[in-house]
Amino acid sequence: MQADILDGKQKRVNLNSKRLVNCNQVDVNQLVPIKYKWAWEHYLNGCANNWLPTEIPMGKDIELWKSDRLSEDERRVILLNLGFFSTAESLVGNNIVLAIFKHVTNPEARQYLLRQAFEEAVHTHTFLYICESLGLDEKEIFNAYNERAAIKAKDDFQMEITGKVLDPNFRTDSVEGLQEFVKNLVGYYIIMEGIFFYSGFVMILSFHRQNKMIGIGEQYQYILRDETIHLNFGIDLINGIKEENPEIWTPELQQEIVELIKRAVDLEIEYAQDCLPRGILGLRASMFIDYVQHIADRRLERIGLKPIYHTKNPFPWMSETIDLNKEKNFFETRVIEYQHAASLTW
């Protein structure tokens, strides 16, 4: 029996040897010992929020959609919102699988990335389920990023950010390479999921607040819960990489990130103006200027940068839904406050 035992104890993982990136000497297949407890907490919280769109009845939404009780402007907001989200979730999922996962060398962080990729698939399924339920032209909705200029501009911007990281020869073992990787993380976690998506949530949840399209609203609430964890994981990942590789956090990189976020804010304002040429449900396109700038400042602060807009939140009810002021940055507080989906009240 003794001959069956291999002399491999030296390959057991040392916790202090683990790093988020550029750590190929540590066996990424060994989950334990867990070093980055924040990554594992995000994974557990994601699993606690498990849901599927088909669990949510759409009968009242179908009845309302087929009636004359929605204005053309209200229908426009819903259709353009679905047009953006239907492919945006796929872009995020593809970026996780094809760009981020291979360059993250920590198993607990990878564990969460796998969970997140599944959730992006569920979200894409959600938009198909909504289209099927309402009898919408699915091809038109899912092709909106080729037919609507404001949606295409946002998605093209995202693809610019991920282009270099998708190159098969891309590496993160240089300062420049790791800086490019961090910009990718900013583009998808901070901008796409933390700015573009939150603006879209306001539009649809405004219907839900007035007891309209309540099935869609409930699904967006579940997506918002998921995306809040995605955002927090992304921020912790960015800050963790900064902490382990302080040489990358140069004034030049910081300014590049600020400029990316400024561009994103401008693009989101243009999209809001396309969605809302006239006011509905107490929403006006001008309100989204303040809101997008407000949440952009909050995202900048959470990765250690100064706010640039200093605008107030015109939608305080969104802060009541997911209180941005109480989101805890792991690297500032070492505390993560989440509630399981089953215990959340709306």
From Swiss-Prot:
It catalyses: a 2'-deoxyribonucleoside 5'-diphosphate + [thioredoxin]-disulfide + H2O = a ribonucleoside 5'-diphosphate + [thioredoxin]-dithiol. Its EC number is 1.17.4.1. NCBIfam families: PRK07209.1, PRK09614.1-5. This is Ribonucleoside-diphosphate reductase subunit beta. Belongs to the ribonucleoside diphosphate reductase small chain family. It comes from Chlamydia trachomatis serovar D (strain ATCC VR-885 / DSM 19411 / UW-3/Cx). GO terms for biological process: deoxyribonucleotide biosynthetic process. It comes from the Bacteria. The active site is at Y129. CDD domains: RNRR2 (cd01049).
